Amino acid sequence: MSIKVFGTKEVQDLLKAATNLEGKGGNARSKQIVHRLLSDLFKAIDDLDITPDEVWAGVNYLNKLGQDGEATLLAAGSGLEKYLDIRLDAADKAEGIEGGTPRTIEGPLYVAGATVHDGVSKIDINPDEDAGPLVIHGTVTGPDGKPVAGAVVECWHANSKGFYSHFDPTGAQSDFNLRGAVKTGADGKYEFRTLMPVGYGCPPQGATQQLLNVLGRHGNRPAHVHFFVSSDSARKLTTQFNIEGDPLIWDDFAYATREELIPPVTEKKGGTALGLKADTYKDIEFNLTLTSLVKGKDNQVVHRLRAEVAA
């Protein structure tokens, strides 16, 4: 059946009425966006001859997505969050902004409220027998290449089971395990003493994995570490690096991998003096370069709902 009704006056009037496009009240921008999205959906139903059963399967899926609390996870897995980064990269290019550590997705598992320490923070609060010690360190520099004092570097990552604190279904981690924040001094240096993470997979019975199964895709990420870097003198940086050697680096279901964000992992001695769980530890140097404000403003601050806990 190839029924085409999208272009009819009846359907176009319905779209205008459903979104109150030409009516008073409401928010004009919201009307514009919803009208466009609803129009695209209606047209897709026409073009693909989507059946009522398929439409209601989609509606039921949205209910499950909300019940599972996985909308932000699906935003990563569907490529939506990566697409936003592609647009931001293009906007930077159009503005002539070059250099800086590449951005990549934030993901769904940040928790605000970590205590900010000066320069160094040991963030492995809970013991983890299966994870070896790791030191992550580097220098925050500005667009001029000089160290940035007073920058706040936030870091968060999974444990050896692939779970993030605060969201851990086993309840084995305190809220800020493997999460921390440090403020740089005049030398721009930061350091986190932690444990080696592993990658994670989507909850196997969750809505995100349900859709990925239909698409014939896996829902796994390589081992990685997230960062926010904030400074009054530069734009906020949202980035992450992958752990070198992980087999999923170039098969990340969230499309967050970038060539410049795979720093080498080296082995060092002297961990005992640093308060680590063993004398031999892994070391990752990850320098962070910020970019200039645009007309005196930080246009990289994204407003979205995030978990927050008092440290």
UniProtKB/Swiss-Prot annotation:
<dbReference type="GO" id="GO:0019614">
    <property type="term" value="P:catechol-containing compound catabolic process"/>
</dbReference>
<feature type="binding site">
    <location>
        <position position="226"/>
    </location>
    <ligand>
        <name>Fe cation</name>
    </ligand>
</feature>
<dbReference type="GO" id="GO:0042952">
    <property type="term" value="P:beta-ketoadipate pathway"/>
</dbReference>
<keyword id="KW-0058">Aromatic hydrocarbons catabolism</keyword>
<feature type="binding site">
    <location>
        <position position="224"/>
    </location>
    <ligand>
        <name>Fe cation</name>
    </ligand>
</feature>
<feature type="binding site">
    <location>
        <position position="200"/>
    </location>
    <ligand>
        <name>Fe cation</name>
    </ligand>
</feature>
<comment type="subunit">
    <text>Homodimer.</text>
</comment>
<dbReference type="GO" id="GO:0008199">
    <property type="term" value="F:ferric iron binding"/>
</dbReference>
<dbReference type="InterPro" id="IPR050770">
    <property type="entry name" value="Intradiol_RC_Dioxygenase"/>
</dbReference>
<comment type="similarity">
    <text>Belongs to the intradiol ring-cleavage dioxygenase family.</text>
</comment>
<keyword id="KW-0408">Iron</keyword>
<dbReference type="InterPro" id="IPR015889">
    <property type="entry name" value="Intradiol_dOase_core"/>
</dbReference>
<keyword id="KW-0223">Dioxygenase</keyword>
<comment type="function">
    <text>Can cleave 4-methyl-, 4-chloro-, and 3-methoxycatechol at lower rates than catechol, but has no activity with 4-nitrocatechol or protocatechuic acid.</text>
</comment>
<comment type="pathway">
    <text>Aromatic compound metabolism; beta-ketoadipate pathway; 5-oxo-4,5-dihydro-2-furylacetate from catechol: step 1/3.</text>
</comment>
<keyword id="KW-0479">Metal-binding</keyword>
<protein>
    <recommendedName>
        <fullName>Catechol 1,2-dioxygenase 1</fullName>
        <ecNumber>1.13.11.1</ecNumber>
    </recommendedName>
</protein>
<dbReference type="InterPro" id="IPR012801">
    <property type="entry name" value="Cchol_dOase_prob"/>
</dbReference>
<feature type="binding site">
    <location>
        <position position="164"/>
    </location>
    <ligand>
        <name>Fe cation</name>
    </ligand>
</feature>
<dbReference type="Pfam" id="PF00775">
    <property type="entry name" value="Dioxygenase_C"/>
</dbReference>
<dbReference type="GO" id="GO:0018576">
    <property type="term" value="F:catechol 1,2-dioxygenase activity"/>
</dbReference>
<dbReference type="Pfam" id="PF04444">
    <property type="entry name" value="Dioxygenase_N"/>
</dbReference>
<keyword id="KW-0560">Oxidoreductase</keyword>
<dbReference type="InterPro" id="IPR007535">
    <property type="entry name" value="Catechol_dOase_N"/>
</dbReference>
<dbReference type="InterPro" id="IPR000627">
    <property type="entry name" value="Intradiol_dOase_C"/>
</dbReference>
